[in-house]
Each structure stands twice: as C-alpha cells, then as structure tokens.
C-alpha cells in the first residue's frame, strides 16, 4: 500500500472502534445528564463562562439575521444574532394555525401547484396536501459570491420537495416536488455569478421509474442529483450517480459543485452501508453538463433531462475519501473545500484549482486532496472565519475544533506541525455549525453557532422530549468563547447567518404583489374593488364574500349563505400602518387566516353546518379588538 493510500484509508479496526464508541456515546449521552466531552463527563454549570457580550439592549437591533431550519416541524425560523431572539416563523411544508398556511387559497396554491401528477392523484383522498415536511438546509441566493437578499431556498427530505422563500415579504412563494429523485437531503445554491442553480442531493436510491414493477431488481435503483433553476423553480437537469448522496456545496467560480457519498456500497442495511473502508466525493462539471443538455445528450425521464453521471462519465469525477463523509463546505478563500469524515476522525481538504486537470485526465482523483488532518471523533460540518481558520463539529467528542487550513496542508506535506488551534466543549453532540457570513466570500470571523442535537441538563426539565441546544460562540479572538445557550424546538438541521445589511424586507404589502393576484383577478371579474367594496356575489351554489378590514371593523357585519354552498371569503386589510395585521376566524368552522397590512387573503370551504357562526379578528389590532367581529348566517336546507 502506498503512503498516499495509507494517509487516506481508515483502518478497519479503527472504523469499528469508532463506530462502537459512537454507539456507546449515544447510549450514555441520550439517557443521562452527563455527556461525552473530550472523554470526560462535565456538569453544565462547569462550562459557564463570560465571553464577549451578546447582549442586545431593549430597542436595539441585532447585527445579523439567522435563518434556521426546523427539520420535522416543516418551517423556517428567523432568529436575531447575537441576541438569539426568535423573531418570526415562516410556515412552508407545515400546516400553520396562526397564519392559515395550508388552508388559505394562496398558500394551498403554493403547496400544490408544484406537485408531481402522481402525487396529486395520491393526495386526492387526503385533503390534497402533504401535512408534514422535514425542512433542512436553508440557504439564501447569491450574486458574485455573497448574499443578494432575494430568496432563501430549503429542502424537504420527507416528501422530496424544494421551497423558495421571498426575503422581501418573508413568505414562501414556490414549492416543487422533484421527479425521479427520492428524498432531498443536502441543498446548496450556486454562488457565482449568481443563483442560478439550486443543487439538490438525492439521498436514497429507488427504481427509476418508481412504479413498483422492478423493486426486486437492484440494478434499477438510482440515486439522482438535481439542479433546479432558482428563478423559474423548474428542474434544469438531473444526473444519475453511483452511491447515495449526502451533503453538497458549490465553488466560487461557477464551474463545479460537489457532493459527499456515504453509501457507495448501495446497500439496504446498516451493515451493508458501512462495509467499505472508503466512500467518495462526487464532483460535477457544470459546463459539460450544460453543453450535453444543449445538444440533447440525455434521456428524458419524468419530463426532465437526465444525464448518466455514473463512474466513467465525462460529467463527474469520484474522489475516494474515508468511510461515510457527511458535510462538505467551501471556504471563503474560493480555493479550499472540506469534506467531513463522520466515521473517520479526519476531514479531507480539496483544492478546487486542481479540478480542471482532474476532468482533463491530467491528474489522479486523490491528487486534488491537499490535506487530511485528524481532528477528533465524529467530524460532521466545517465553518470558516475568513482568516484561514476552520471550525469543525465533533459529534462524538461534543466539541468544536478550530484548525488552520495552511498548517493542515503543511502537515500533509510531511512537516511536523499541528494544525489544531483550540477545542471547545459544546453541549451536546453538535451537528451543523455556521459562522457569521462564513458561507460567503465576506466571512467576518465574529460569531459561530453550534447546533447541538442534545440539551440534556442545560435547561429546566420539560418532560421526555427535550429541546435542542444552539450555542453562540465568540470566535473573534485566538480561542473560542461560549457566550450563550439557546433552546429550540424540534429540530434545526442547519442555519445561515446573514448580515442585516443584506436583507431589506417591506413593512406592508404592495397591492400589485403576485402572491394574491388570483384574488385580485377574481374580484375584477366580479366588478369588485377589493380596497373599497364589501359585497356578496352568488354564482349558483358558489358564493364569494368580499370584505374589507380596517381596525376595529370588518366591512360586513354579517353575510348569509345556504347550507351546502361553497363559500370563498376574501378579506382585504386596508390599513396602511405597519404591524397592523388582522386575522379572520369563523367560530366552529375551523377557519383562521392572517391578513397583513395591504394584503388580501382568501379561504374556501363548504357551509355544511346551519346556524349562526361569529367571525372575529384573531390578531389584537386595536383597543376595540373584542368588538371586531360579525356573523355568518347559514340557512338550513329546505328553510
């Protein structure tokens, strides 16, 4: 075995030892108040420290927006940093009682118009909607290597979807379901020249097409990598690959993206998935893929172009790395990319400048690797400070490791130098971590957030289900300083820290906004001015109720419909004062929706229950809030 192979390969005994250690750590850590942290059990209070101030005084504003995923809760959460105050939740894949997301016509259109035809058929007897989502990996759009404030994209692992949030109004305006692909795990966006593509990893292989006819034929199973056009929210192209895909990132030159693979064995069981001592990173050549699509060198499957990127393809290269790599993260220097080992104590550092030669077959795959430092047990994700330092989460060690990229390269070249600068205990078992602006060329090296999977003893006991623990860390000095614990509900998988200067939301809606354009068009057809008129339009057994709302009164004190009518209520908030949001709730009908200033919202339902049903404003918008109400009168059939 060559020295190069010795550097790279994870000894089978080491791998099994690491795996056993991980299992033991999970068993101890999940059950008790103590956790594995550098090999010692540390009480929570022993870790309290006073670092740089994270205090944001009353009336002052945070320096950063932090966009958190929520995993199985299905929403985006907006937190301010460094205060770590939660400011807003954006419902996306979930049903939201507060805002009516998933019930209003506007939100249902977003949630359904991008579904695959077979999914629409599948959901016909289930209300027409998926009622769950597993939202991971929120990432904003880029222009020239930094955030441009237009959009935020995220994936739904549970139902193979991708969403887009408009950052001017902080609302989801597009959701699409990916054909051919089964699950979406890693998601990142094109950094240069702009977004551009949204890259989506297919984690699990299934037969393509997945119609139940070839389930026993392993050769029919394929994992799929997808590029979505971030402007049109349509699939631009897909690439079939060998092995499962995990996480993904892109370069700063607009030439390549790259994904980790943790199941090169293409196994169906845990033992099968861990059988090999090596997996790989897949590198995608965007120019070659685009040229092939333009020339028609693809198969159309599920209505989209699909290219064959399996081993030997001109579109991809496979670089061997130690077993089960997880995160892959591009450094702000535009040169280095780090794949994190997970089952190996190492991370693998690539130099993107070598990728051209790799695709031109001038060098071997492992020649793109320039460092492979050993950092600790369970490296999952790496963040950067823009000063040449990297910060890697060590899941099993419950630590964040600060290390220097150039020193790691020197050590890989044979020099006796230790790249590790500092290790900090975190609480407990960290997954993702992110630095302020650290995923852009403008990394500022101020803050790091460690998203920890277990909180254990850090908070008052709230029962068997515990919060996660997101910890704010000051990285402005030579050593990291833990300054704040922040509990979060299930379950953030990722976060992005964006300087507030990059985001510029509106305070009130623009009346020309496309979000409620369908309501405007219907009102025009009914000769209704939404900003003025409050009227009832009957069209057979379909009734359209239009009303304005201006605190503290709705435009209609009551309206009458017949039992069995299909009723659509349109409410337009004509208040122009910022933060004067109204709500519209019909008692005992299960109807509630948000109506923000200058917005129109609508909801459609069947008036199946006769009688008197009051509607009222659910937002406290006025001193006469309790009086802001009216009656829906439902005439009984035959009355």
Swiss-Prot record:
Name the UniProt key words of this record, in alphabetical order: Calcium, Copper, Metal-binding, Oxidoreductase, Periplasm, Plasmid, Signal
Q: Which cofactor does it need?
A: Ca(2+); Cu cation
Q: Which residues bind Cu cation A1?
A: 582, 617, 621, 628
Binding of Cu cation A2 occurs at 617, 619, 621, 625
Write one Gene Ontology MF term.
Answer: copper ion binding
Please tell me where Cu cation Z2 binds in this chain: 136, 185
Binding residues annotated for Cu cation Z3, in chain numbering: 137, 432
Q: Which CDD domains match?
A: N2OR_C
The residues the record assigns to binding Ca(2+) 2 are 262, 265, 273, 279, 324
UniProt binding sites for Cu cation Z4? 493
Any one Pfam family match given in the protein's UniProt record, by short name: Cupredoxin_1
Q: How is it modified after translation?
A: Predicted to be exported by the Tat system. The position of the signal peptide cleavage has not been experimentally proven.
Q: Which positions does UniProt annotate for Ca(2+) 1 binding?
A: 453, 468
List GO BP terms, alphabetically. Answer: denitrification pathway
Q: Does the keyword Cytoplasm apply?
A: no
Q: Which parts of the sequence bind Cu cation Z1?
A: 326, 381
Q: How does it assemble?
A: Homodimer.
Which protein is depicted? Answer: Nitrous-oxide reductase
Organism in which the protein naturally occurs:
Rhizobium meliloti (strain 1021)
Gene designation per UniProt: nosZ
């Amino acid at each position: 075995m060559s020295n190069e192979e010795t550097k790279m390969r994870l000894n089978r005994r080491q791998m099994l030892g690491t795996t056993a250690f991980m299992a033991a750590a999970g068993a101890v850590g999940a059950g008790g108040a103590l956790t594995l942290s550098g090999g010692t059990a540390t009480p929570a209070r022993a870790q309290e420290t006073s670092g740089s101030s994270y205090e944001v005084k009353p009336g002052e504003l945070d320096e950063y927006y932090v966009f958190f995923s929520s995993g199985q809760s299905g929403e985006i959460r907006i937190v301010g940093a460094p205060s770590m105050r939660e400011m807003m939740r954006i419902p996306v894949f979930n049903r939201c009682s507060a805002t009516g997301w998933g019930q209003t016509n506007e939100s249902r259109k977003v949630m359904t118009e991008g579904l695959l035809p077979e999914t629409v058929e599948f959901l016909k007897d289930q209300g027409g909607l998926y009622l769950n989502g597993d939202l991971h990996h929120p990432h904003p759009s880029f222009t020239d290597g930094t955030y441009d404030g237009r959009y935020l994209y995220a994936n739904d692992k549970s139902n193979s979807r991708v969403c887009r949030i408009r950052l001017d109004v902080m609302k989801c305006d597009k959701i699409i379901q990916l054909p051919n692909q089964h699950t979406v795990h890693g998601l990142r966006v094109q950094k240069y020249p702009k977004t551009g593509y949204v890259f989506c990893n297919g984690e699990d292989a299934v037969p393509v097409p997945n119609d139940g006819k070839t389930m026993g034929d392993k050769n029919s199973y394929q994992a799929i990598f997808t590029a979505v056009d971030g402007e049109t929210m349509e699939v631009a192209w897909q690439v079939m690959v060998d092995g499962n895909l995990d996480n993904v990132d892109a370069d700063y030159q607009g030439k390549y993206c790259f994904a980790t693979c943790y199941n090169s064995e293409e196994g169906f069981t845990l033992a099968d998935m861990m059988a090999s001592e090596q997996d790989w990173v897949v590198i995608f050549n965007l120019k070659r893929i685009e040229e092939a699509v333009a020339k028609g060198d693809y198969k159309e499957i599920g209505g989209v172009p699909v290219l064959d990127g399996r081993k030997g393809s001109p579109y991809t290269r496979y670089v061997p790395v130690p077993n089960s790599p997880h995160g892959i993260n591009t450094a702000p220097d535009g040169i280095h990319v780090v794949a994190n080992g997970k089952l190996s104590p190492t991370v693998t550092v690539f130099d993107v400048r070598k990728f051209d030669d790799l695709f031109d077959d001038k060098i071997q795959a492992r020649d793109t690797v320039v460092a492979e430092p050993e950092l600790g047990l369970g490296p999952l994700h790496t963040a950067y400070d823009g000063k040449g330092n990297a910060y890697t989460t060590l899941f099993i060690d419950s630590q964040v490791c600060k290390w220097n990229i150039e020193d790691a390269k020197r050590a890989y070249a044979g020099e006796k130098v230790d790249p590790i600068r500092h290790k900090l205990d975190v609480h407990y078992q960290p997954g993702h971590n992110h630095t302020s602006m650290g995923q852009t060329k403008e990394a500022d090296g101020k803050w790091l957030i460690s998203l920890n999977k277990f909180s254990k003893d850090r908070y008052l006991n709230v029962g068997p289900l515990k919060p996660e623990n997101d910890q704010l860390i000051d990285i402005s000095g030579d050593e990291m300083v833990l300054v704040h614990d922040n509990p979060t509900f299930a379950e953030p998988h990722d976060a992005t820290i964006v300087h507030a200067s990059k985001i510029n939301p509106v305070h009130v809606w623009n009346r020309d906004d496309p979000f409620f354009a369908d309501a405007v068009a219907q009102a025009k057809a009914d000769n209704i001015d939404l900003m003025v008129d409050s009227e009832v339009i009957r069209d057979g057994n379909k009734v359209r109720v239009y009303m304005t709302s201006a605190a503290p009164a709705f435009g209609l004190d009551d309206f009458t419909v017949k039992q069995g009518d299909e009723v659509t209520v349109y409410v337009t908030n004509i208040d122009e004062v910022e933060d004067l949001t109204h709500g519209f709730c019909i008692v005992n009908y299960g109807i509630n929706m948000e109506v923000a200033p200058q917005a129109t919202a609508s909801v459609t339902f069947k008036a199946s229950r006769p009688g008197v049903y009051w509607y009222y404003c659910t937002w406290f918008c006025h001193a006469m809030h309790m009086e802001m109400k009216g009656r829906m009168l439902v005439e009984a059939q035959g009355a």
